Swiss-Prot record:
UniProt effect for mutating residue 393 to D: Reduced salicylic acid (SA)-induced PR1 gene expression but maintained interaction with TGA3
Main localisation: cytoplasm
Protein name per the record: Regulatory protein NPR1
Impact when changing residue 55 to A: Normal binding to SUMO3 and subsequent sumoylation associated with its localization to nuclear bodies and elevated levels of defense genes expression (e.g. PR1 and PR2) leading to severely retarded plant growth
Post-translational changes noted in the entry: Phosphorylation at Ser-55 and Ser-59 prevents sumoylation to ensure stability and quiescence.
Induction, per UniProt: By salicylic acid (SA), benzol(1,2,3)thiadiazole-7-carbothioic acid S-methyl ester (BTH) and 2,6-dichloroisonicotinic acid (INA). During the hypersensitive response (HR) following infection with the avirulent Pseudomonas syringae strain ES4326/avrRpt2, programmed cell death (PCD) subsequent to effector-triggered immunity (ETI) results in NPR1 degradation at the site of infection, but is accompanied by NPR1 accumulation in cells surrounding the HR lesion.
Motif range (SIM3, required fo binding to SUMO3 and subsequent sumoylation): 345-348
Subcellular localization: Cytoplasm; Nucleus; Nucleus, Nuclear body
Length: 593
C-alpha cells in the first residue's frame, strides 16, 4: 500500500510551474523573473542541476562540507556554507555570526546549534534533512519510509501521530529558516488532515500554528474553530496551550453560548499539589474530604503531566480506580499509552488496569500506542546491551498483556523449601537480573522500578556464607559449618528479584528467551561432560558454548568500554567505576559450576 502523504510525490518533480515568480521577496529560494518562460530543455537542465546539488548534500563522505548543524540529541548534519549562504538569507546571517564566534574562540569547525535556532518546538533528524535537502535542490522529498507512518498495520497513515509530527516539524523548520513556499505547502497538507486527527493532536497543531503566527493564519484559525466547538476540558487546554490562546477559546465558547465548566477549587488544589510533586500535600487535601482522586481525575492528571515518580507514588496510595474514565472517556492506561512511558504502563497493569478497555472512538491502549509510535521505531529490534526506544517498549508491553491470560504466571519462590535449594534460587535470581541489566538495560530498569528493587540489599556470595550469618570465624577445615538460613533483611530482596523476573517474563518474552538460554544450567553442565559423545554432538555443544560466550563477551565489552570512557574524563570517579565493574563480575560469579 502506498503510504506517501498526499501531495508529496508530485512536489518532487521540477516543472515550469515550479518556477513561476512571485512577489514574495522574503523567500529564501531565488526565483526566475516573471517574464522568463521555461522550455523543455530548460526544465531538463534545472532537473540535472537540482540532482547534482542534491547528490552533493547526500554524499556519504561529507564531500568537502565545511559546517555542521548539531541536533538536540547530539547528531550532526554536515552542509556546505557556500551553498546555504547563497540559497538562504537566514543561513547567510547565521553562518556569518557563527564564523565570527569560531574565529574568536579558535574552534576547528563552524557549527550551528539547532536548539539555539529552533527553541520553541522539538524537531527530529529526518525533518531537518528533508528541509536542508529542499534548500539544496528546490525539491520536496517524500517522507522517509517508516518515519511518517505509525506501527498500526490497519492505519492509512494520513492523520496518525507520526504523520502529523513529521509535517509539523518540517513546517516549523520552514518557518525558522524563512522558506515561505515550504510553509505554504505543509500548511496545506495539515489543513487537509486537521479534521481527521484526534482532538489531542489538534491541540498540538494549534500550538505550533500559534508559534508560526501570521505565516500560518489559515491553519491557526481552523484549529481554533475545531477546539472551540470540541469538548476539550479546561485542564487540557491550560496544560497544552499558552494562556492568551486559552482565554481566546473560552471567550469564543461563551459567545457561541457553549458551556464553559470551571475546574472546582478542591480539584484544582489537588492538581497544583501534583504539579509540585507533593504527594504528602495530596494526602492532606484528601483528608479534608472535599474530593477524591477519582472525582479529581488525579491519576489521569499525574500520568499525563507529572514526572514518572510522582505518578507512581500516587498510584501506590491505592486510593484511585485505575480503570476510571475521565470526561473524554479515557482510562488512565489510555493516557499512559499516549504519553509513551513504559514504566507508567507497567505500573498500571500491575495495579489491575484493563488493556481491553476502549475509548469512545473504539481505540484500546494498544491501538493508541501503535498509532503514536513510528513504524521504523517499532520495527527496529534493539541490539543487546543497548537501550530500547520507549515507543517500541510500550507496544511490546501492551501486546504481551493481550496474551497474558493464555500464559501461566510464574509462582514466586517459597521460603518453605530446603536451605540449599533456596540459596541457589537466590543466586540464580541475582545473576539473572544482573545479566538482564547488561543485555537489556531499558527493559530491566523498567521491571526493577516496578518491583521496587531500590533500597533492597544485594545478595553477594559473602553475605550468604554461614560464617557471616553465625558471626563465627573458620579456623580449620574441620570446623562444622552452620546450615544456610535466610535473614529477614534478605526477604525483601528475594521478593523484588522474583517480581523483576516475573515482570520480565510477562512483558518482555523476547528478552527472557535470551536470558533463559544463558541461564540454562543443564546446558552448561553438559558441556563439561560427555566423554562418550559423538563428534557431531560435541560440535553442537561447542557451538552452543560459543553462542553463550559471545553474548557474555559483548555484554562485558560494552560495560568495560563505558567504564574506560568514564575514567578518561574523570580520574576521581574512575576508581569508583572500577569498583562497580568488579562488582558486576562478582555478581556473575554466583553461577553454579
Amino acid at each position: 500500500m502506498d503510504t506517501t502523504i498526499d501531495g508529496f510525490a508530485d512536489s518532487y518533480e521540477i516543472s515550469s510551474t515550479s518556477f513561476v515568480a512571485t512577489d514574495n521577496t522574503d523567500s529564501s529560494i531565488v526565483y526566475l523573473a516573471a517574464e522568463q518562460v521555461l522550455t523543455g530543455p530548460d526544465v531538463s537542465a534545472l532537473q540535472l542541476l537540482s540532482n547534482s546539488f542534491e547528490s552533493v548534500f547526500d554524499s556519504p563522505d561529507d564531500f568537502y562540507s565545511d559546517a555542521k548543524l548539531v541536533l538536540s540529541d547530539g547528531r550532526e548534519v554536515s552542509f556546505h556554507r557556500c551553498v546555504l549562504s547563497a540559497r538562504s538569507s537566514f543561513f547567510k546571517s547565521a553562518l556569518a555570526a557563527a564564523k565570527k564566534e569560531k574565529d574568536s574562540n579558535n574552534t576547528a569547525a563552524v557549527k550551528l546549534e539547532l536548539k539555539e535556532i529552533a527553541k520553541d518546538y522539538e524537531v527530529g533528524f529526518d525533518s531537518v534533512v528533508t528541509v536542508l535537502a529542499y534548500v539544496y535542490s528546490s525539491r520536496v522529498r517524500p517522507p522517509p519510509k517508516g518515519v511518517s507512518e505509525c506501527a498500526d498495520e490497519n492505519c492509512c497513515h494520513v492523520a496518525c501521530r507520526p504523520a502529523v509530527d513529521f509535517m509539523l516539524e518540517v513546517l516549523y523548520l520552514a518557518f525558522i529558516f524563512k522558506i515561505p513556499e515550504l510553509i505554504t505547502l505543509y500548511q496545506r497538507h495539515l489543513l487537509d488532515v486537521v479534521d481527521k486527527v484526534v482532538i489531542e493532536d489538534t491541540l498540538v497543531i494549534l500550538k505550533l500554528a500559534n508559534i508560526c503566527g501570521k505565516a500560518c493564519m489559515k491553519l491557526l484559525d481552523r484549529c481554533k474553530e475545531i477546539i472551540v466547538k470540541s469538548n476539550v476540558d479546561m485542564v487540557s487546554l491550560e496544560k497544552s496551550l499558552p494562556e492568551e490562546l486559552v482565554k481566546e477559546i473560552i471567550d469564543r465558547r461563551k459567545e457561541l453560548g457553549l458551556e464553559v465548566p470551571k475546574v472546582k477549587k478542591h480539584v484544582s488544589n489537588v492538581h497544583k499539589a501534583l504539579d509540585s510533586d507533593d504527594i504528602e500535600l495530596v494526602k492532606l487535601l484528601l483528608k479534608e474530604d472535599h474530593t477524591n482522586l477519582d472525582d479529581a481525575c488525579a491519576l489521569h492528571f499525574a500520568v499525563a503531566y507529572c514526572n514518572v515518580k510522582t505518578a507512581t507514588d500516587l498510584l501506590k496510595l491505592d486510593l484511585a480506580d485505575v480503570n476510571h474514565r475521565n470526561p473524554r472517556g479515557y482510562t488512565v492506561l489510555h493516557v499512559a499509552a499516549m504519553r509513551k512511558e513504559p514504566q507508567l504502563i507497567l505500573s498500571l497493569l500491575e495495579k489491575g488496569a484493563s488493556a481491553s478497555e476502549a475509548t469512545l472512538e473504539g481505540r484500546t491502549a494498544l491501538m493508541i500506542a501503535k498509532q503514536a509510535t513510528m513504524a521504523v521505531e517499532c520495527n527496529n529490534i534493539p541490539e543487546q546491551c543497548k537501550h530500547s526506544l520507549k515507543g517500541r517498549l510500550c507496544v511490546e508491553i501492551l501486546e504481551q498483556e493481550d496474551k497474558r491470560e493464555q500464559i501461566p504466571r510464574d509462582v514466586p519462590p517459597s521460603f518453605a523449601v530446603a536451605a540449599d535449594e533456596l540459596k541457589m534460587t537466590l543466586l540464580d535470581l541475582e545473576n539473572r537480573v544482573a545479566l538482564a541489566q547488561r543485555l537489556f538495560p531499558t527493559e530491566a530498569q523498567a521491571a526493577m522500578e516496578i518491583a521496587e528493587m531500590k533500597g533492597t540489599c544485594e545478595f553477594i556470595v559473602t553475605s550468604l556464607e554461614p560464617d557471616r550469618l553465625t558471626g563465627t570465624k573458620r579456623t580449620s577445615p574441620g570446623v562444622k559449618i552452620a546450615p544456610f538460613r535466610i535473614l529477614e533483611e534478605h526477604q525483601s530482596r528475594l521478593k523484588a528479584l522474583s517480581k523483576t523476573v516475573e515482570l520480565g517474563k510477562r512483558f518482555f518474552p523476547r528478552c527472557s528467551a535470551v536470558l533463559d538460554q544463558i541461564m540454562n544450567c543443564e546446558d552448561l553442565t553438559q558441556l563439561a561432560c560427555g566423554e562418550d559423545d559423538t563428534a557431531e554432538k560435541r560440535l553442537q555443544k561447542k557451538q552452543r558454548y560459543m553462542e553463550i560466550q559471545e553474548t557474555l563477551k559483548k555484554a562485558f565489552s560494552e560495560d568495560n568500554l563505558e567504564l574506560g570512557n568514564s575514567s578518561l574524563t574523570d580520574s576521581t570517579s574512575s576508581t569508583s567505576k572500577s569498583t562497580g565493574g568488579k562488582r558486576s563480575n562478582r555478581k556473575l560469579s554466583h553461577r553454579r559450576r
